[in-house]
Amino acid sequence: KNILTVEQPDSSSSDGIFYYDEASKRVQISALAL
């Protein structure tokens, strides 16, 4: 299965989660407040 890594930006950056999919070489930004 695809390996998905999740990273959280610093508080200085806008709130969001970066999803990086190595298989698709795509980066999606989700503006979800945790």
From Swiss-Prot:
One cellular component GO annotation, for this chain's record?
cytoplasm
Question: For this protein, what is the EC number?
Answer: 3.4.-.-
Main subcellular location of this protein, as a coarse class:
cytoplasm
Is this entry keyworded Zinc-finger? no
Signal sequence coordinates: none
The yes or no answer to whether the keyword Nucleus is present is yes
Localization per record:
Cytoplasm; Nucleus
**Cofactor dependency:** a divalent metal cation
Q: What class of enzyme is it?
A: hydrolase
Keywords, A to Z, come to: Cytoplasm, Developmental protein, Hydrolase, Metal-binding, Metalloprotease, Nucleus, Phytochrome signaling pathway, Protease, Signalosome
Its Gene Ontology biological processes?
proteolysis; red, far-red light phototransduction
Q: Which GO terms describe its molecular function?
A: metal ion binding; metallopeptidase activity
As for what it does, the entry says: Probable protease subunit of the COP9 signalosome complex (CSN), a complex involved in various cellular and developmental processes such as photomorphogenesis and auxin and jasmonate responses. The CSN complex is an essential regulator of the ubiquitin (Ubl) conjugation pathway by mediating the deneddylation of the cullin subunits of the SCF-type E3 ligase complexes, leading to decrease the Ubl ligase activity of SCF. In the complex, it probably acts as the catalytic center that mediates the cleavage of Nedd8 from cullins.
| Family per record | Belongs to the peptidase M67A family. CSN5 subfamily.
**Quaternary assembly:** Component of the CSN complex, probably composed of CSN1, CSN2, CSN3, CSN4, CSN5 (CSN5A or CSN5B), CSN6 (CSN6A or CSN6B), CSN7 and CSN8.
Q: What name does the UniProt record give this protein?
A: COP9 signalosome complex subunit 5a
Organism whose genome encodes this protein? Brassica oleracea
